[in-house]
Amino acid sequence: MEGEAVEAIVEESETFIKGKERKTYQRRREGGQEEDACHLPQNQTDGGEVVQDVNSSVQMVMMEQLDPTLLQMKTEVMEGTVAPEAEAAVDDTQIITLQVVNMEEQPINIGELQLVQVPVPVTVPVATTSVEELQGAYENEVSKEGLAESEPMICHTLPLPEGFQVVKVGANGEVETLEQGELPPQEDPSWQKDPDYQPPAKKTKKTKKSKLRYTEEGKDVDVSVYDFEEEQQEGLLSEVNAEKVVGNMKPPKPTKIKKKGVKKTFQCELCSYTCPRRSNLDRHMKSHTDERPHKCHLCGRAFRTVTLLRNHLNTHTGTRPHKCPDCDMAFVTSGELVRHRRYKHTHEKPFKCSMCDYASVEVSKLKRHIRSHTGERPFQCSLCSYASRDTYKLKRHMRTHSGEKPYECYICHARFTQSGTMKMHILQKHTENVAKFHCPHCDTVIARKSDLGVHLRKQHSYIEQGKKCRYCDAVFHERYALIQHQKSHKNEKRFKCDQCDYACRQERHMIMHKRTHTGEKPYACSHCDKTFRQKQLLDMHFKRYHDPNFVPAAFVCSKCGKTFTRRNTMARHADNCAGPDGVEGENGGETKKSKRGRKRKMRSKKEDSSDSENAEPDLDDNEEEEEPAVEIEPEPEPQPQPQPQPQPQPVAPAPPPAKKRRGRPPGRTNQPKQNQPTAIIQVEDQNTGAIENIIVEVKKEPDAEPAEGEEEEAQAAPADAPNGDLTPEMILSMMDR
């Protein structure tokens, strides 16, 4: 049953297509007169006159129907035996004339003469003459008075069949018989082409050859005329079958109008399309309209042409008439077959880019590639500012607005907007469930067999014209080998400076480096006089100093919250940042607190040095001021308090760690180092009365944590000697020693 249903659909489709083709053929027949002036109407009725006026003021009238008696008479005349009855019959038969038709004056379009056939009465007596002597001419002359100066004179020369005489019909209907002397020369080259033609024995006076001529924009153009010479073998008019002329009433096929040096083309008024034929232009104009007259009787879809409808019907019936000669595949359209052979068999890429070496199988891909040179993005998104070079990417982008996800994972049923995203999902999430195809030439593993075929064709196929490495002179005939070779140049510093030891991997880096030697700064600011070696520096300068809307980027330290304008500065700070709690920085760096303390010490150092230079010395003869001796010692850092003991014993304290003493105390850099503070005491000897100077070294107790009971004494000690002077108790104790 299914087979019968398919056959019924096929028969119905063929009947439908044939009906469409007949209607289309009839419409083309009716409108084909405008396409070519030399084409004659295909359907005529017996005895009917078809006159077609297409911007023409001259029409040629010829005999449509030949009487059978006339054909028989013509044969007898050629053989030399003509019966009197036949002569009488010919007297009352037909005559071929050329009549002037007065038309309305309008510009004459070149090459738009039409031949039509009408029956006319014939009253011409025939004498016993040969065929050669009956060669005549029809002259259709239009007086110059009736035409404008720009309109051409048209002359048409034809050979006469036997049994006819040439007459001239005037504008008012008067008939004038042409004499033999007025006939055109017999040596026209167009007559000599006929194999049955024999040159006349008697030479006649030579006159100018009569041709159909017209003028186009001041240039004379020759036009070939119709040739109606007789053929003895078939007894027909030249180049026309007599049975078709008499039975079907179809006129002979005209020759094409040939213009010397002029090629007529038709151009679309709506775009830049050009074509050599009017029918092609008419078919193209349908692409600018929404007219789709051809509808499918199965699904209702409409198409512009019958060819598109036929291809569509093949999709219903499953017919694939176009078979590939190189494999077993078949296609619905011829375009699909051509594209298949180029991709699979011939690898031909006829569409080449004029700006680079790119070549493509399809012209649409070439147009898309050319937009990469011009930067044109004609396909604009109506919802945002996105623009694309082709419609495919625009459709893919529109899914981000619509939320459509047409691609579904067959394992977990997750949906995606792009097929590539779905493939990556399958490879990453469902690797154990995916069939793996290993490339036999490399280590590549591919999930789909079709993708493996693409990989083999692109990476491992043999290239007849080898490709050269862009880094060296090596040539490879395989793309994969070329890529692997170029990877060996990736980390190679091939560009070396000829003025220093600098080397780099990229040429652009070397160009920028050489500007440090030459001092060249080609990038100048348009708002000030600054120049730069790199364009990035110019852009940064312009944004920072000349752009009022510029907001500098803030790089915040994650430890202390401090902001920086440059990332590398922030990274350098973060390596040694102590954080908000004052914890020592990483990699053994100084803490934030210690850095600030050091800055304060350096400031106080400068102040002390300036004060010491400006201060005047004020020293007594007997003693020296030792004020700095007490204050120079830095305050000891707090240490954990030990457990108190009931009876503390003086114990020599351990030396403080080196880490606790950093830097030099302020105001002591230019002074000589003093080991211990000293004091001069004058003592008078009671026996002799001499005065002796005793130098006393003040030994300061090392810093130690006092006990709880000794805190008050330690705090009161500085009050006794605020300036560091020796008290009397100290002097007496030293004298006792």
Curated annotation (Swiss-Prot):
Residue numbers of N-acetylmethionine PTMs: M1
Ranges annotated as biased composition (Acidic residues): 610-636, 704-714
Pfam families per the UniProt record, alphabetical: zf-C2H2, zf-C2H2_16
Locations listed in the record: Nucleus, Nucleoplasm; Chromosome; Chromosome, Centromere
Biological process annotations from GO: cardiac muscle cell development; cardiac muscle cell differentiation; chromatin looping; chromatin organization; chromosome segregation; DNA methylation-dependent constitutive heterochromatin formation; epigenetic regulation of gene expression; gene expression
Compositionally biased intervals (Pro residues): 637-657
Sorted UniProt keywords: Acetylation, Activator, Centromere, Chromatin regulator, Chromosome, Chromosome partition, DNA-binding, Isopeptide bond, Metal-binding, Nucleus, Phosphoprotein, Repeat, Repressor, Transcription, Transcription regulation, Tumor suppressor, Ubl conjugation, Zinc, Zinc-finger
Coiled coil: none
Transmembrane segments: none
A GO term for molecular function: sequence-specific double-stranded DNA binding
PTM comment: Sumoylated on Lys-74 and Lys-699; sumoylation of CTCF contributes to the repressive function of CTCF on the MYC P2 promoter.
Region feature Disordered, mapped onto this chain: 180-211, 573-687, 699-727
Modification Phosphoserine occurs at: S402, S609, S610, S612
GO CC terms of this entry: chromosome, centromeric region; condensed chromosome; dense fibrillar component; granular component; male germ cell nucleus; nucleolus; nucleoplasm; nucleus
Chain positions of all zinc fingers (C2H2-type): 266-288, 294-316, 322-345, 351-373, 379-401, 407-430, 437-460, 467-489, 495-517, 523-546, 555-577
Record bears the keyword Nucleus: yes
Cross-link (Glycyl lysine isopeptide (Lys-Gly) (interchain with G-Cter in SUMO2)): K18, K219, K699
Biased composition (Basic residues): 202-211, 593-604
Keyword ATP-binding carried by entry: no
Gene3D superfamilies registered for this protein in UniProt: Classic Zinc Finger (3.30.160.60)
Residues carrying Phosphothreonine: T289, T317, T374
Subunit note: Interacts with CHD8. Interacts with LLPH. Interacts with CENPE. Interacts with BRD2; promoting BRD2 recruitment to chromatin.
Similarity annotation: Belongs to the CTCF zinc-finger protein family.
Protein role: Chromatin binding factor that binds to DNA sequence specific sites and regulates the 3D structure of chromatin. Binds together strands of DNA, thus forming chromatin loops, and anchors DNA to cellular structures, such as the nuclear lamina. Defines the boundaries between active and heterochromatic DNA via binding to chromatin insulators, thereby preventing interaction between promoter and nearby enhancers and silencers. Plays a critical role in the epigenetic regulation. Participates in the allele-specific gene expression at the imprinted IGF2/H19 gene locus.
PANTHER family associated with the record: GASTRULA ZINC FINGER PROTEIN XLCGF49.1-LIKE-RELATED (PTHR16515:SF49), PR DOMAIN ZINC FINGER PROTEIN (PTHR16515)
Protein name per Swiss-Prot or TrEMBL: Transcriptional repressor CTCF
Organism of provenance: Rattus norvegicus
Phylogenetic placement of the source organism: Eukaryota, Metazoa, Chordata, Craniata, Vertebrata
